[in-house]
């Protein structure tokens, strides 16, 4: 069940509970892709253009562009043009702190599950 304070705030903004859940699906669905996670982590180190991302991650141009567009639409990354290049950078206001929280949670819980699975204990 969704937090009533969050729901109250969303209703004030004109969102329904269903819209909020659909927005959650879009947000978390963006994080399901391993390629998008790799792009996010690469951009946490600094801005990059498509060619730099392709080279660093070994992903083809079409996939990089498609994933960057999804990340941009969902507010995970921002783009800026410098000369003839478009550079992408992480959304420092929201995504950087969120990734730090996620990593803290993963190091406390998920890594242990992953290691147990690899050892055949899970």
Region spans (language model):
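N-terminal helix-turn-helix DNA-binding core of bacterial DNA-binding proteins
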Residues: 19-63, 82-94
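Residues within the DNA-recognition helix of helix-turn-helix
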Residues: 67
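Amphipathic alpha-helical dimerization/coiled-coil segments
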Residues: 2-23, 95-122
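Alpha-helical residues within the helix-turn-helix
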Residues: 55, 72-73
